């Protein structure tokens, strides 16, 4: 919250699968102050257009009109919800409150967008970012394109807080197939439960592959200059791993 007052967006929440998943199979690393999961985004082109090319680079007048239309829609929904709430039971009221909380966040972002409307974004070159790569066919290119978008977020100071869940290991997400596609191994979830002889070598190969992607991110951060030096020198980065075996840390 402290950092968000200086940027266009409070945070950027990314993953390879998008959404929030569910309690034991989350697909986001971000939660709000109430513990509610923040939906993650995973389609590169949509991410780019939403955060770095609002309204497809439309003129300011058109973008202002779009913001005002969005605010009107939010106001109408909020007004209707007040009438609806009086007719709901206690459980449904709780669900509605969750929805209204999300709607308030939308309204807050619309107001933020309006405040930043006349402030130009820093110049950047996105020509080398692949916005159309598919995680099911080119995992490395996909992961690195997401990292490129993260760096762009820091470089333009669009946000100062970003999370990225590279892969779920529950056997359900795109990332579960990464070791199959890039290394010819079993699925991520299968490897994590494997007790056969030699399975640690498979774990090691997969961990090394992820470490290489992280190294790519670190190197690009190091070579991207900020006002006070490299992005790497001015950023706190936390890189975490999955369980070592079955459900054990």
Where do the protein language model's features map onto the residues?
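Ligand-binding pockets and gating/stacking loops
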Residues: 1-249
């Amino acid at each position: 919250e402290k950092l968000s007052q200086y940027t266009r967006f409070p945070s950027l929440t990314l993953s390879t699968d998008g959404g929030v998943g569910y309690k034991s199979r989350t697909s986001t690393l971000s939660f709000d102050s109430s513990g509610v999961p923040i939906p993650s985004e995973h389609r590169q082109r949509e991410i780019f257009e939403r955060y770095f090319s609002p309204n497809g680079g439309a003129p300011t007048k058109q973008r202002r009109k779009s913001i005002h239309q969005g605010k009107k829609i939010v106001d109408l929904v909020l007004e209707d919800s007040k009438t609806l709430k009086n007719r709901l039971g206690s459980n449904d009221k709780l669900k509605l409150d969750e929805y209204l909380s999300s709607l308030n966040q939308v309204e807050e972002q619309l107001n933020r967008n309006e405040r930043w409307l006349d402030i130009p974004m820093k110049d950047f070159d996105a020509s080398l970012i692949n916005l159309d790569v598919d995680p099911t066919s080119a995992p490395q290119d996909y992961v690195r394109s997401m990292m490129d978008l993260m760096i762009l977020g820091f470089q333009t100071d669009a946000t100062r807080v970003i999370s990225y869940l590279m892969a779920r290991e529950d056997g359900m997400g795109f990332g579960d197939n990464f070791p199959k596609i890039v290394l010819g191994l079993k699925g991520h979830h299968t490897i994590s439960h494997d007790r056969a002889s030699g399975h640690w070598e498979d774990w090691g190969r997969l961990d090394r592959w992820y470490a290489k992607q992280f190294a790519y991110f670190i190197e690009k951060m190091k070579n991207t200059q900020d006002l006070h030096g490299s992005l790497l020198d001015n950023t706190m980065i936390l890189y975490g791993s999955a369980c070592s075996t079955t459900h054990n840390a």
